[in-house]
Amino acid sequence: MATVILFVAWMACLMVGVCYQEFQTQQNFPDISNPSQELNQEPAHRIVQLDSIQNNGALNMSTGNVLNMSPPPPSPCLSRAKIRHAFKYVTTILSCVIFLVGIVGNSTLLRIIYKNKCMRNGPNVLIASLALGDLFYILIAIPIISISFWLSTGHSEYIYQLVHLYRARVYSLSLCALSIDRYRAVASWNRIRSIGIPVRKAIELTLIWAVAIIVAVPEAIAFNLVELDFRGQTILVCMLPMEQTSDFMRFYQEVKVWWLFGFYFCLPLACTGVFYTLMSCEMLSIKNGMRIALNDHMKQRREVAKTVFCLVVIFALCWLPLHVSSIFVRLSATVKRACILKNKRSCIMAEIQTGVNYQLLMVMNYTGINMASLNSCIGPVALYFVSRKFKNCFQSCLCCWCHRPTLTITPMDEKGSGGKWKANGHDLDLDRSSSRLSNKYSSS
């Protein structure tokens, strides 16, 4: 419930900035009769505006082959698209909140899994991989996003592009691995889960990060700092150059948007849908006697499955706006090119990247960037409210930073096989080694 409230509050703040942006845009874009009047040359933020620039360039190249009777392309924008100060302030404040919550939440989550032996298992290792990728993104990309609103450089945009796409790959592959792991756990219900990191899971985690690096090679090679001339000003932009030398890079340039949407967004959702459907069928096929005997055991696995499903839903909600905006820009450029080639002067979509509509595309793009950044800090918050075990660990870990925990020994039997650790009002069961150690000191 609290996760939903946080998500709604985040969207409300973004919508306030968007509404103010549109209001200011309508006031600052009157009917201009003299295009040569002096324009405001405020620097514009240029992160993830690559497809717009690239498609405009491709459009100008394609119109050169049209017959003389074809209509000329639409006139260029009278001013550079820019983000108003209200939207800058809102996004900067929200980026600072993401930075603080993400640093505390993800570092605490990694500490919990590292310190507690009972938390070192297969699914938690994959969750730790998600937290490590989010922490890596927060430390590098979030400061670049905040600073680039006020001072943008091409080199920082290049770093942001690589970190952003690499983190998206790690996240999507880890979610796929989590869905497969949950199905295997339910399908092999008679397998007792051991404490510790299995060798197979360590190899799987290494492959996830290695595959993410390999898939990142096209972007690392293709993305380059390109100098663009706009009304006498030289702009340094990180983008895919319009002229590629190899056939593979030209093909990648055409399918890039659909590749990112299919691999980074649809693949985790498809894996979750398929394996969770199989998992539901497997749980329904268990006999009643087996279900009663393994009631507690299956409850734990259902709780982990619910946690993974919650992470996938949050991933879908946070990344959908960014992919929708990228696809919209791509489709609008395609329709615009088709309208010009078919000699339709009054095509509505032909004006979609000029004037006020281009401002709307920028707002959509920045909303998608902020929502994708929100995904890097909301994972630990979701785990706190969904998983009872993670909630107890978060409370004990965060409280022990403020107060020294007190250890009270309560022997459960004469063998000393039980014990409790009371820290700040929370009772947590000790493992066997801690119980034997505490029983030794209590007997002495």
From Swiss-Prot:
PROSITE patterns xref list: G_PROTEIN_RECEP_F1_2 (PS50262)
Comp. bias intervals (Basic and acidic residues): 424-434
Biased composition (Low complexity): 435-444
Ranges that cross the membrane: 89-113, 125-145, 162-180, 202-226, 255-279, 308-328, 366-386
Cytoplasmic side: 114-124, 181-201, 280-307, 387-444
Domain of life: Eukaryota
Record family assignment: Belongs to the G-protein coupled receptor 1 family. Endothelin receptor subfamily.
Protein's name according to its UniProt entry: Endothelin-3 receptor
Native organism: Xenopus laevis
